[in-house]
Structures are given as structure tokens and as C-alpha cells.
UniProtKB/Swiss-Prot annotation:
Domain of life: Bacteria
Residues given in the record as L-methionine binding sites: E56, Q99, D239, K270
Residue ranges crossing the lipid bilayer per the database entry: none
Metabolic or biological pathway: Amino-acid biosynthesis; S-adenosyl-L-methionine biosynthesis; S-adenosyl-L-methionine from L-methionine: step 1/1
Positions that bind Mg(2+): D17
Keyword vocabulary terms for this entry: ATP-binding, Cytoplasm, Magnesium, Metal-binding, Nucleotide-binding, One-carbon metabolism, Potassium, Transferase
Biological classification of the source: Bacteria, Pseudomonadati, Pseudomonadota, Alphaproteobacteria, Rickettsiales
Function comment: Catalyzes the formation of S-adenosylmethionine (AdoMet) from methionine and ATP. The overall synthetic reaction is composed of two sequential steps, AdoMet formation and the subsequent tripolyphosphate hydrolysis which occurs prior to release of AdoMet from the enzyme.
Reaction(s) catalysed (UniProt annotation): L-methionine + ATP + H2O = S-adenosyl-L-methionine + phosphate + diphosphate
Family membership: Belongs to the AdoMet synthase family.
Listed Gene3D superfamilies: 3.30.300.10
Location of region: Flexible loop: 99-109
Designated name of the protein: S-adenosylmethionine synthase
Catalytic activity, EC: 2.5.1.6
Species of provenance: Rickettsia prowazekii (strain Madrid E)
């Protein structure tokens, strides 16, 4: 396609599914802080007055899961009983077992480089030159809107804002380049006494306009603010939340393929996470080097086997090299065995909670080692 319209969405840290993601990654972080080789597959379910944490965890450390959960919920902003969900008084249930020995036998290896993949599957990484972060523009701007909403809420600049919110940005493309924002949808939970007219004006003037580039906004850009007219009841009171239910928000907003496995709550031996980071790392360096305008990488694995089953690069006709030549460069210069990915991207020492909101890719924090452009010379 050359001329088209494309939409991506983001959600706030107070969205039920994102609460679940953050709790799962908070548990993971606490374990890896004391046991870098801990094996974690942590799933979280949140609903009215209840948090259920389950999964398979093998570690030599102790973690007070209940306290981790309560701290994270209150940090997000659910610290008031009037919100209907409060980290200080909700019920917390934990149901954790050890990792299956049948799985562990395929992963455990004294030689870190030969650690087998934690499961079969394929992952995708993507990059394009639409934004400075080499991310697709719709998801990039949708995330920025949610960051702005959280900032105004936490700084008490708009005191009527509440933690739950969603954004959606639609861009019009010509010749595969974003030229204008067609519409912005933003729904935010709010105090019951704020008037709809005042809310709409504040969201447009304080959230949208300071965040989105003026050259992409125009007189016909449509602003759809809290379209139902009221969003007082939100968070887990309105909808239950589950870990891994926002995988498109977490990745590329639908602009690229997704292997299907979520990221949050998984230690880096799980290729759903570590290999997806590696695929982004490769794709970003290809685009960052100017070799291609767009690049999508697929890597696939078999459980218990270190080397990938397959590697494929797609540059959509924008590269100076063929897809086959690009793939050959990748396999020659990047070690995609899980153990080497973990070592080279320093995945045992990450703060994974930072990834659980506003996307795992396109971030400027040094914590996001897979965003480094330190391999561009390979592709020049």
C-alpha cells in the first residue's frame, strides 16, 4: 500500500490489563534482583477487590508477593477506596508452582551460551523511519498521549483525572509516509463532578495539543473525547484485567506482525520476550543504518534448542539489498541463541516494570538495551 489510513491505540498504566502486566513484571523484577537465574512465568488477574497471581516460578529467593502487588497498585494510583479498587485493602491470592521439570531439562545448561529456548514459537521485530525512535507513528503518538495523561494526573495539574485511560490515533499516509492525523480518540476516567464540556476542552488543550506535532494536526482533525459522555467507573471495577492481553499495544500497534506470545511476567529464557527484543534490536539497526526504510524480522525456535530454527528479514522493497542478502548479514553478525541474547542485551539486570507501560519498543531509557544503535556499521 502507498496511500492509506492507519490506526493504533495505547492504554494507561491504570487500565486493568496494564495493571496485570505491571504486577507480573514487578514480581519478576523482585525475583531477578535477588536471583538473576530465577525462572519466572507469572500471570495476574485483577477484578473488583481481588488480585490473583499464578504461574510457574523456580527460584532460590523469597518474595513477598502480596506486598509487591499492593505496592504496585498504589504506585499506579489506585490508593483511594472511592475509586472502587485500592491497593491497601484489596484481596491478594497467590497460586505459584515450580517450573515443570520436563521444561527445565531442556533449558538448564552450565554453559550459558547453550541454554535452550524456553518454548517453541516465532517472534517478530520491526522498525521504520517514521519517527525519531524508528517506530510507527500511530503507536508512537498514542503512547505519548497516555504518558501526558499520567503526568497531568500524578502532578495534580488536572486533579479530576483518574488512572484508567485509552488513546487512539489515526494517521493518513501518502506514498507510505504519514502526512496528517485524521482523528484522535481519548477516553479518560474522571471525577464524577467534572463537566463534560470542561473535560473535553482540558483534554484537547492540555493533553492532545501539547503532545502531538502541530504539522500533523489540521483544521479537520477530529477529536473524540470520552465519546460515551461519562467515564467515572474504571479500572478493575469496570473490567477485569489479565496479563498479556495488550500485546499489540506492547509492540507496534498492529503495523507489524506479532508472534502471539506476550512479554510481561516472563524471565528472559522465554523467547517470547528475549528474542522479540533481539528482533527489534536487529530491525532498528538496519533502519538506523539507512539500509532500509522499513524492516521486519522473524526468528523462530524449538523448545530446548539454542539455535534458531529460522531467521527471515523483510524490507518491503525499501532496501538497497535483497531480503536474502539482508538475512545473510544478520545470521553472520548476530548470535540469536537465548543465552547470548540474555548476555549481550543484559537481560538478567533489567527493570522490566518499565516495559510494562507505554510499549516495550521505541523507548529512550538506557534500560532498554535493545534500542541501542550500536550495530549500524554492519549494514553500511
Amino acid at each position: 500500500m502507498k496511500n492509506f489510513v492507519f490506526t493504533s491505540e495505547s492504554v494507561s498504566e491504570g487500565h486493568p490489563d496494564k495493571i496485570a502486566d505491571q504486577i507480573s513484571d514487578a514480581v519478576l523484577d523482585e525475583i531477578l534482583k535477588h536471583d538473576p537465574n530465577g525462572r519466572v512465568a507469572c500471570e495476574t488477574f485483577v477484578t473488583t477487590g481481588l488480585v490473583l497471581v499464578g504461574g510457574e516460578i523456580t527460584t532460590n529467593t523469597y518474595v513477598d508477593i502480596e506486598q509487591v502487588v499492593r505496592n504496585k497498585i498504589q504506585e499506579i494510583g489506585y490508593n483511594n477506596p472511592n475509586y472502587g479498587f485500592d491497593g491497601s485493602c484489596c484481596a491478594v491470592i497467590s497460586s505459584i508452582i515450580k517450573q515443570s521439570p520436563d521444561i527445565a531439562m531442556g533449558i538448564d545448561n552450565e554453559n550459558e551460551e547453550e541454554i535452550g529456548a524456553g518454548d517453541q514459537g516465532m517472534v517478530f521485530g520491526y522498525a521504520c523511519n517514521e519517527t525519531k525512535s524508528l517506530m510507527p507513528a500511530p503507536i508512537y503518538y498514542a503512547h505519548l498521549l497516555m504518558k501526558r495523561q499520567a503526568y497531568l494526573r500524578k502532578q495534580n495539574i488536572l486533579s479530576w483525572l483518574r488512572p484508567d485511560a485509552k488513546s487512539q490515533v489515526t494517521l493518513r499516509y501518502e506514498n507510505n509516509k504519514p502526512i496528517v492525523i485524521d482523528s484522535v480518540v481519548l477516553s479518560t476516567q474522571h471525577h464524577p463532578e467534572i463537566q463534560q464540556k470542561d473535560l473535553i476542552e482540558a483534554v484537547i488543550e492540555e493533553i492532545i495539543k501539547p503532545t502531538l506535532p502541530t504539522n500533523l494536526l489540521h483544521k479537520d482533525t477530529k477529536y473524540l473525547i470520552n465519546p460515551t459522555g461519562r467515564f467515572v467507573i474504571g479500572g478493575p471495577v469496570a473490567d477485569c484485567g489479565l496479563t498479556g492481553r495488550k500485546i499489540i499495544v506492547d509492540s507496534y500497534g498492529g503495523m507489524a506482525k506479532h508472534g502471539g506470545g506476550c512479554f510481561s511476567g516472563k524471565d528472559p529464557t522465554k523467547i517470547d520476550r528475549s528474542a522479540a527484543y533481539m528482533a527489534r534490536y536487529i530491525a532498528k539497526n538496519i533502519v538506523g543504518a539507512g539500509l532500509a526504510d522499513r524492516c521486519e524480522i522473524q526468528i523462530s525456535y524449538a523448545i530446548g534448542v539454542a539455535d534458531p530454527v529460522s531467521v527471515y528479514a523483510e524490507t518491503f522493497g525499501t532496501s538497497k539489498l535483497s531480503n536474502e542478502q539482508t538475512t545473510k548479514l544478520i545470521t553472520e553478525h548476530f548470535d540469536m541463541r537465548p543465552g547470548k541474547i540474555i548476555k549481550n542485551l543484559k537481560l538478567h539486570t533489567q527493570c522490566y516494570q518499565k516495559t510494562a507501560t507505554y510499549g516495550h519498543f521505541g523507548r529512550e531509557d538506557e534500560n532498554f538495551t535493545w534500542e541501542q544503535l550500536d550495530k549500524v556499521d554492519i549494514f553500511k
